């Protein structure tokens, strides 16, 4: 089917019984930073918080009445499932929804809420492709009509109405429209419409690095099935793209860019700062891709449109997003630093951090000769981490830059510590101090040099006050003097030396 055939299907698509024309909203802060006008096509504001409602309803509106009466079935990573459930409830038909077991609970609950008693939810497999295989078996057993999440002309046309709205809402020059890609339905529909109406506008697909089936397929010239897919951007975790979507993307798409998890987290934060809305990872793909493209191509004063495709975010994922956004936006650098285990070296190292805001500081005495510190600091530009590491090295502190090391960011930062045979006469304290620039360095400066620091843990949580865990080696003979030191210190504290968890894991 050529683009002009899809043009007719898109123009006559039945989506507005359930969906509405979403805003094309300027992202003012992001535009200023990228030096390019950026507009967000706010599909995250649809009734199911995702664009998927368009294609699902359009497909179901074209199913013959007798087949529709028997019921429909679909497989989905979550958002299409909500679209089918919502449409089924509106049409008064039964629907079976198969979702992967990895689907966020917020999406599973929403499917049931939108569909009501007429919807049956089955969880099967770890990815969309696994759920799809199971759905085909159920379809054959029950004689249901399958509503494909992306590889169907009516679904593609329904998603293509987004492009129709964008070009009507912004009739001036547009350099590129960025769309997320899982199976390719949205990208295929948008590209087919744009190339039929405004062929000078680029359409760029965006995928997660660990779920880039379309990028690999276009590079190979044929559909490539991935052995595994990453699940952070669960809404686009597709192992094999559709036949029709691949054909259309191969013909009309101008390219695909891939982004990592940190870039996705940074994009979620960017959209929040401009709109006060929280996108899901897949919903932020287009924004992350637009940022990467603008930086890579070195463009300025070019209008960029990003489709914010969904906002079905699990609340408990937000902490991870907040932490990783700093690295993705080149605002945090992470290092492992080795310092000599001698009096004054800890404080000397801290002085090198200077006026930079410390985001994390983990240390545990482990060796009589040297100590290893895990430290995070805020940075202002890409590449600054290399300068900081070089400065540490020039002052005799062996340094490893871990800013882009996945193991360190995901696990090691939480595992620094443990029992130490060298932590003799250790007493453990939680200190509280106001969270402001320079406050950590001021606290460290107030630590008396008479007692060795054997443990130190700090993480900036974004609160107005922070808690620091400090272990100090205080011989029995020094207890009276140490108590006077604590009283004069001026920071609220709680001694945790008798804490059961400390006794089990650290003492």
UniProtKB/Swiss-Prot annotation:
Domain ACT-like: 333-404, 427-498
Pathway info: Amino-acid biosynthesis; L-isoleucine biosynthesis; 2-oxobutanoate from L-threonine: step 1/1
GO biological process, one term: threonine catabolic process
Xref: CDD domains: ACT_ThrD-I_1 (cd04906), ACT_ThrD-I_2 (cd04907), Thr-dehyd (cd01562)
InterPro entries in the cross-refs: ACT-like_dom_sf (IPR045865), Ser/Thr_Dehydratase (IPR050147), Ser/Thr_deHydtase_PyrdxlP-BS (IPR000634), TD_ACT-like (IPR001721), TD_ACT-like_sf (IPR038110), Thr_deHydtase_biosynth (IPR005787), TrpB-like_PALP (IPR001926), TrpB-like_PALP_sf (IPR036052)
Lineage top rank: taxon: Bacteria
Binding residues annotated for pyridoxal 5'-phosphate, in chain numbering: 79, 182-186, 309
Catalytic activity, EC: 4.3.1.19
Keywords per UniProt: Amino-acid biosynthesis, Branched-chain amino acid biosynthesis, Isoleucine biosynthesis, Lyase, Pyridoxal phosphate, Repeat
Keyword Repeat (UniProt): yes
Catalysis: reaction(s): L-threonine = 2-oxobutanoate + NH4(+)
PROSITE patterns: ACT_LIKE, DEHYDRATASE_SER_THR
Modified residues (N6-(pyridoxal phosphate)lysine): 52
Molecular function terms, GO-annotated: L-serine ammonia-lyase activity; pyridoxal phosphate binding; threonine deaminase activity
The protein's required cofactors: pyridoxal 5'-phosphate
NCBIfam families in the record: ilvA_2Cterm, PRK09224.1, PRK12483.1
Function: Catalyzes the anaerobic formation of alpha-ketobutyrate and ammonia from threonine in a two-step reaction. The first step involved a dehydration of threonine and a production of enamine intermediates (aminocrotonate), which tautomerizes to its imine form (iminobutyrate). Both intermediates are unstable and short-lived. The second step is the nonenzymatic hydrolysis of the enamine/imine intermediates to form 2-ketobutyrate and free ammonia. In the low water environment of the cell, the second step is accelerated by RidA.
Family: Belongs to the serine/threonine dehydratase family.
Record-given protein name: L-threonine dehydratase biosynthetic IlvA
Organism: Burkholderia multivorans (strain ATCC 17616 / 249)
Gene (name only): ilvA
């Amino acid at each position: 089917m050529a683009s002009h055939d899809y043009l007719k299907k898109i123009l006559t698509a039945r989506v507005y019984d359930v969906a509405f024309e979403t805003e094309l909203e300027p992202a003012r802060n992001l535009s200023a930073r990228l030096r390019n006008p950026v507009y967000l096509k706010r599909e995250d504001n649809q009734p199911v918080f995702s664009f998927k409602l368009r294609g699902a309803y359009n497909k179901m509106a074209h199913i013959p009445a007798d087949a529709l009466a028997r019921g429909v079935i679909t497989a989905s990573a979550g958002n299409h499932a909500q679209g089918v459930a919502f449409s089924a409830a509106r049409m008064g038909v039964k629907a079976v929804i198969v979702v992967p077991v990895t689907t966020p609970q917020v999406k599973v609950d929403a499917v049931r809420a939108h569909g009501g008693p007429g919807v049956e939810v089955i969880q099967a497999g770890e990815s969309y492709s696994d759920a799809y295989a199971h759905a085909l078996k159920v379809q054959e057993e029950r004689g249901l009509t399958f509503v494909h999440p992306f590889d169907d002309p009516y679904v593609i046309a329904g998603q293509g109405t987004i492009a129709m709205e964008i070009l009507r809402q912004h009739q001036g020059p547009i350099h590129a429209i960025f769309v997320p890609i899982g199976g390719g339905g949205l990208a295929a529909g948008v590209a087919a419409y744009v190339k039929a109406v405004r062929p000078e506008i680029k359409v760029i697909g965006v995928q997660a690095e660990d779920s880039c089936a379309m990028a690999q397929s276009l590079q190979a010239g044929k559909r490539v099935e991935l052995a595994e897919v990453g699940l952070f951007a669960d809404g686009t975790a597709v192992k094999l793209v559709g036949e029709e979507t691949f054909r259309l993307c191969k013909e009309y798409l101008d390219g695909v860019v891939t982004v990592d998890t940190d870039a996705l987290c940074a994009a979620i934060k960017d959209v929040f700062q401009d709109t006060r809305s929280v996108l899901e990872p897949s919903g932020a793909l287009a924004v992350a891709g637009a940022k990467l493209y603008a930086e890579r191509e070195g463009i300025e004063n070019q209008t960029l449109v990003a489709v914010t495709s969904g906002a079905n975010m699990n609340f408990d994922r937000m902490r991870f997003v907040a932490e990783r956004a700093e690295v993705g936006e080149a605002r945090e650098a992470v290092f492992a630093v080795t310092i000599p285990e001698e009096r004054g070296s800890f404080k000397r190292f801290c002085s090198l951090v200077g006026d930079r805001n410390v985001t994390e500081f983990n240390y545990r005495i482990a060796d009589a000769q040297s100590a290893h510190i895990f430290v995070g600091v805020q940075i202002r530009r890409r590449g600054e981490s290399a300068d900081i590491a070089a400065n540490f090295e020039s002052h005799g502190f062996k340094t490893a830059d871990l800013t882009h090391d996945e193991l360190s960011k995901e696990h090691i930062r939480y595992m620094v510590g443990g029992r130490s045979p060298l932590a003799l006469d250790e007493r453990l304290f939680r200190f509280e101090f106001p969270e402001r620039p320079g406050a950590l360095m001021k606290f460290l400066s107030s630590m008396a040099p008479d007692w060795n620091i054997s443990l130190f843990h700090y993480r900036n949580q974004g609160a107005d006050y922070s808690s620091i865990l400090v272990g100090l080696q205080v011989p029995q003979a020094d207890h009276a003097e140490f108590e006077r030191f604590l009283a004069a210190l001026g920071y609220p504290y709680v001694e945790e030396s008798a804490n059961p968890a400390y006794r089990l894991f650290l003492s």
